[in-house]
């Protein structure tokens, strides 16, 4: 399994994405193991769904393999159990996909924007300016790694993200300090509860 990016590699990647007169304020990368732990519940639930589907399938085929050429109620239940099995397998793979994506992600805060850089065959950079940031949330995550969420849902979707998860820096150490730096750079007031 490939190791996470070193701080020097992260900084080099972040600096390569800067504009000519842009200053790097902070850069970092998500912790792949913390990302994996954060999504473990999905895999546990998915294994339950998968085992339920296998059990159901074994009960349906207990009297021999049914004739699937003729329509019968067991045909429908077998198809449903296969569908549930696929859902369970997909859910069990979520932590591994998140772990792989965390190893390929770099976060950067500059004097003009927040950047999320995704490495792969094609380097994808999503930039969030002051107007895109919206309400800032800070959440405590696993293993001392916190989540710093900042993108408005509209800006996240507009920049190619999913509407179910706002943009932000996930599973980073000391997200509160990064939040303070962002507020200083963009001159945003501290929110009171």
Regions found by a protein language model. Give the residues of each.
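Alpha-helical transmembrane spans
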Residues: 33-104
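A residue-level signal for beta-strand positions that form part of recognition/binding surfaces
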Residues: 23, 106, 147
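Conserved beta-hairpin
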Residues: 26, 89-132
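Long, distal/terminal scaffolding or interaction modules
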Residues: 20, 47-51, 127
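Short, charged cytosolic
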Residues: 2-28
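A membrane-cytosol interface segment of integral membrane proteins
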Residues: 2-3, 140-193
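Acidic, Ser/Thr-rich low-complexity segments on the non-lumenal side of membrane proteins
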Residues: 113-157
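Short, mixed charged/polar active-site loops
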Residues: 23, 122-125, 163-166
């Amino acid at each position: 399994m490939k190791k996470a990016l070193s701080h020097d590699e992260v900084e080099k990647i972040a600096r390569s994405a800067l504009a000519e007169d842009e200053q790097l304020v902070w850069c970092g990368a998500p912790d792949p193991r913390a990302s994996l732990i954060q999504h473990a519940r999905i895999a546990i639930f998915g294994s339950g769904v998968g085992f339920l589907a296998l059990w159901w399938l074994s009960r349906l085929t207990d009297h021999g393999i049914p004739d699937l050429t003729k329509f019968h109620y067991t045909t429908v239940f077998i198809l449903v159990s296969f569908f549930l099995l696929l859902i369970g397998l997909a859910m069990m793979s979520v932590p591994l996909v998140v772990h792989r994506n965390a190893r390929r992600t770099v976060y950067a805060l500059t004097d003009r924007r927040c950047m999320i850089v995704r490495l792969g065959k094609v380097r994808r950079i999503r930039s969030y300016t002051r107007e895109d940031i919206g309400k800032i949330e800070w959440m405590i995550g696993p293993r001392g790694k916190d989540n710093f969420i900042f993108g408005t849902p509209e800006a996240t979707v507009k920049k190619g993200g999913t509407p179910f998860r706002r943009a932000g820096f996930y599973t980073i150490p000391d997200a509160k300090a990064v939040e303070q730096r962002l507020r200083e750079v963009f001159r945003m007031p501290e929110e009171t509860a």
